[in-house]
Structures are given as C-alpha cells and as structure tokens.
Amino acid sequence: MQRRNQKVIEFAPAWSISEETRKKILDSAKRLARRVGYTNAGTMEFLVDEEEHPYFIEMNPRIQVEHTVTEMVTGIDIVICQILIAEGYPLNSPTIHIYSQNEI
C-alpha cells in the first residue's frame, strides 16, 4: 500500500498470489540473477495481472528501505550478508548459511 508514491504497508509474502505464481516469479528472478552474474543482495520487482501472469519490471541492485520487512520474514540480516558477500563469502558458507533459496 502506498501513500504519495511511498510504501507505507507491505505484505510479505504476497497473500494474493498462488504458490504456482510465486514459484514462477522466484524461478524468473533466479534465472535473471544467474544470467547477468549477479551475486549480492538486491530486489527484483514483478507485477502480476488478474490471471496471475507475472511481469518483470525492474531490479534494484541495492538494499531498499523496506529491507527490514524482508529481514523479519526471512530471519536474515541482509546488510551483514551484503558485506560478507562483497568480501567473497558464498551464500552457502557457514558464516552466511543460506544454503538454498527454498530456505528463505
């Protein structure tokens, strides 16, 4: 929900889409990140129409102001992870311990 083009309420995970659509979005985001060689924290945004067709709209290769919502949902400190990844730690290292996207 937005007010004056600023997000004031965020629902996460999105309650209005099916698991099938959620999986399509996740798979698309992972494919894009692999394709461009992106290996750090970022946000990919999708729109979904009434028939649940997802459309990619943008990628923000940075931590957004709403990152605290993601941290609450996932239990992952994104800022620390971003620094560790920049230092060369892989996601599945014991320091970061994100072994698969399914764990998030």
Residue spans for each PLM region:
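ATP-dependent carboxylate activation and anion-phosphoryl transfer catalytic cores
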Residues: 1-104
